[in-house]
Structures are given as C-alpha cells and as structure tokens.
C-alpha cells in the first residue's frame, strides 16, 4: 500500500522514479509522495496524474480523468 496523490492509501501501480516499484513505502508523505500518480488507486494507469485518484479502480471517469482514458478504457 502506498500513499496516493490525494492523501489516501491504496494499491500501488508499478512505475519507475524515486519510489521504485511503489511497494510498501510507508505513510503518506514518505517514499511515495514524489511518485504520486503511479500510486493512484487506478491500477496500471501509468503516469496519469493526480486526477487519476478520482477514477477508483479504473471505473467511471469524469472529465478530470481524461489522462486515464487510454489506460482505463474510459
């Protein structure tokens, strides 16, 4: 579990960068804070930005989730 971009914890998606694979990286504001988007609870959405936090599990996507659409099928 990692800290997501909106300050809640959820399943982490693989990504590069400072968090490595975004494994168990502790509380919000620690390892995962620079990793933000990759730790959003959207599964394998890739780097879709903080708005991805509103996608849930790649489910219904509002306008804010536009960057997730290629990954979430929205």
UniProtKB/Swiss-Prot annotation:
Q: In which tissues is it expressed?
A: Testis.
Where exactly are the transmembrane stretches of this chain? none
Q: Is the keyword Transport in the record?
A: no
Presence of keyword Manganese? no
A GO BP term here is: sperm axoneme assembly
Which domain of life does the protein's organism represent? Eukaryota
What UniProt keywords apply to this chain's record, in alphabetical order? Answer: Developmental protein, Differentiation, Repeat, Spermatogenesis
Q: Which family does it belong to?
A: Belongs to the MST(3)CGP family.
The free-text domain note is: This protein is mostly composed of repetitive C-G-P motifs.
Spell out the protein name for this chain.
Male-specific sperm protein Mst84Db
Instruction: Give the organism the record lists.
Output: Drosophila melanogaster (Fruit fly)
């Amino acid at each position: 579990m990692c800290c997501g971009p909106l300050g809640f914890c959820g399943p982490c998606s693989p990504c590069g960068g400072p968090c490595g694979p975004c494994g168990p990286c502790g509380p919000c504001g620690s390892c995962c804070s620079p990793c933000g988007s990759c730790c959003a609870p959207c599964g394998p959405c890739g780097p879709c930005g903080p708005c991805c936090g509103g996608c849930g599990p790649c489910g219904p996507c509002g306008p804010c989730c536009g960057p997730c659409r290629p990954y979430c099928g929205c």
